[in-house]
Amino acid sequence: MARYTGPVTRKSRRLRVDLVGGDNSFERRPYPPGQAGRARIKESEYLLQLQEKQKAKYTYGVLEKQFRRYYAEANRRPGKTGDNLVILLESRLDNVVYRAGLARTRRQARQLVSHGHFTVNGKKVNVPSFKVSQYDIIDVREKSRSMLWFEEAQEALVDTIVPAWLQVVPSTLRILVHQLPERAQIDIPLQEQLIVELYSK
């Protein structure tokens, strides 16, 4: 599946938000790239809406065509379209692996899932965009548990704080999805209503 593989820090600076988490380069230079990066530019309503969409896309590693599908599904569901959109993105398997502390970044989580290191309810899943459901059980495949990365992650899980809607069992590298997240439980700096306004035009 196509995905953005370019420099994430540059995108973080352009959108003025840390898309990776703990990006030291962004912390040092949180202004847009380029010689005039520090100058304050008057932003139009459209530009603000576009920036929020780009922020969501790059945070979750989703390209435009797939993002439109997420929006269409969010719009069909009952409730607030913006909330639905963020919850759908947050429910991706690669994001759940990241939130559970089994990857340092969403990009790394996407790679681990793509390489077939996880099962969902006992079945191998190598699609990062796979949507988890309430009561799903996600495991690291037995033959993958001896990998150095998972051994190190297992030790770090003791001190890892995971979202309330997830539970991680460090001894078995198991992730339990107790429920799908509510918007208030998702700590990303995103104004999703601006995305709704953009697509509603």
Curated annotation (Swiss-Prot):
Keywords: Ribonucleoprotein, Ribosomal protein, RNA-binding, rRNA-binding. GO terms for biological process: ribosomal small subunit biogenesis; translation. It comes from the Bacteria. Disulfide bonds: none annotated. Residues 91-151 form the S4 RNA-binding domain. The keyword Nucleus does not apply. GO terms for cellular component: small ribosomal subunit. One of its GO terms (molecular function) is rRNA binding. Gene3D superfamilies: Ribosomal Protein S4 Delta 41, Chain A, domain 1 (1.10.1050.10), RNA-binding S4 domain (3.10.290.10). One of the primary rRNA binding proteins, it binds directly to 16S rRNA where it nucleates assembly of the body of the 30S subunit. With S5 and S12 plays an important role in translational accuracy. Part of the 30S ribosomal subunit. Contacts protein S5. The interaction surface between S4 and S5 is involved in control of translational fidelity. Belongs to the universal ribosomal protein uS4 family. This is Small ribosomal subunit protein uS4.
